[in-house]
Amino acid sequence: MSTEDLNMSAATKNVLAKVRRIIPPMLESFHKGQLGRVAVIGGSENYTGAPYFSAMASARLGCDMSHVICTPAAATVIKSYSPNLMVHPLMRQSPAPNPNQDPATRDTSKDPDSDPEHISAQIIDLLPRLHVLVVGPGLGRDPLMHATVARVIRAARNRGTPVVLDADALILVQKDPGLVRGYDGAVLTPNVVEFAKLCEALKVDVSEGASETARVEALAKTLEGVTVIQKGAKDYISNGETTLTVDLQGGRKRSGGQGDTLTGSIATFLGWRKAYLDRLWDVGQNALGEHELVGLAAFGGAAITRECSRLAFAKKGRSLQASDLTEEVHVAFLNIFGEEDEETDSSRL
């Protein structure tokens, strides 16, 4: 399928042409791990699908190594979904309360599995092996889980590791905006409800009747350079300075879990961003600027997700589920970007 068949606006096609430059060629000189090592942190006793969908989208799009860091209860289930993912049962949920013990007297120093410092240290030890983190899919609202990932996010920020935050991880930003404020390697992917809660918590000043672009710009400016994707009928992406609109057609079914394809797809593009910055291939003259690449990665992930949704909806209609998007990731990539051996086709980007 050509880009014309996707009814792209000229502006969208121009941005996607830039995104295409981030995508690594398939060279024999590359070795395992150079084209993206992504970890999804989430997955709790009640939520095992979300981290799987995110990690599989990342893998299907083309990252070399896709990890899931979750609780032991979730790990067994996620491992059964796919042997292609590396699953680390390092997260812990708060222990069930003991009715015979006053919570204030509980000594967590004698129970390392209740100590967020101890738990997060094991995850932080993995950061040198990773290029990108996704935090939030299936995380839930357990306070120990939140305390743990907050420490991991700070450590990732100190290393300059990009972090994509979604779902319940956005609650952390509501409570402590300083966790990401001023970090241009952070990407937030709120839906309409989550976006409104962020704006309220951060006291974002947006006049009544303001446009969607004005709203997303205001939130991004409040967060001082964080990239925000406001998901909706169209996706609006802004870091407070540059704002992009993703207007590709998607599907009309809004089943839960589609945002997990988005986070995983963005993560792979951010992994490719590192390969691009490391000049693992000849990127040509007039290289894209480092500051621009995060927004382009977000745009690429949003475009892939919308095309996955369109393809899946065409097949499944109102029965569409999040797993149906996972099956469409590679075809969506080919439809939008093509592959190197097809670049002689002028319809490809």
UniProtKB/Swiss-Prot annotation:
Q: May I have one GO cellular component term?
A: cytoplasm
Any idea which positions bind (6S)-NADPHX? 138, 191-197, 260
Residues the entry annotates as binding ATP: 231-235, 250-259
EC numbers, comma separated = 4.2.1.93
GO BP, sorted A to Z: metabolite repair; nicotinamide nucleotide metabolic process
Q: Which InterPro entries match?
A: Carbohydrate_kinase_pred_CS (IPR017953), CARKD (IPR000631), Ribokinase-like (IPR029056)
Point to the regions of Basic and acidic residues compositional bias: 104-117
Q: Keyword annotations for this protein?
A: ATP-binding, Cytoplasm, Lyase, NAD, NADP, Nucleotide-binding, Phosphoprotein
| PROSITE patterns (alphabetical) | YJEF_C_2 (PS01050), YJEF_C_3 (PS51383)
Molecular function (GO) terms for this protein are: ATP binding; ATP-dependent NAD(P)H-hydrate dehydratase activity
YjeF C-terminal domain sequence ranges: 15-336
Name the reaction it catalyses: (6S)-NADHX + ATP = ADP + phosphate + NADH + H(+); (6S)-NADPHX + ATP = ADP + phosphate + NADPH + H(+)
Q: Where in the cell is it found?
A: Cytoplasm
What segment(s) does the record annotate as region Disordered?
89-117
UniProt cofactor(s)? Mg(2+)
Record's keyword annotation contains Nucleotide-binding:
yes
Please name the HAMAP family in this protein's record.
NADHX_dehydratase
* Family membership noted in the UniProt record: Belongs to the NnrD/CARKD family.
| Entry-linked PANTHER family | ATP-DEPENDENT (S)-NAD(P)H-HYDRATE DEHYDRATASE (PTHR12592:SF0), ATP-DEPENDENT (S)-NAD(P)H-HYDRATE DEHYDRATASE FAMILY MEMBER (PTHR12592)
What does this chain do? Answer: Catalyzes the dehydration of the S-form of NAD(P)HX at the expense of ATP, which is converted to ADP. Together with NAD(P)HX epimerase, which catalyzes the epimerization of the S- and R-forms, the enzyme allows the repair of both epimers of NAD(P)HX, a damaged form of NAD(P)H that is a result of enzymatic or heat-dependent hydration.
What protein am I looking at? ATP-dependent (S)-NAD(P)H-hydrate dehydratase
Q: Which organism is it from?
A: Fusarium vanettenii (strain ATCC MYA-4622 / CBS 123669 / FGSC 9596 / NRRL 45880 / 77-13-4) (Fusarium solani subsp. pisi)
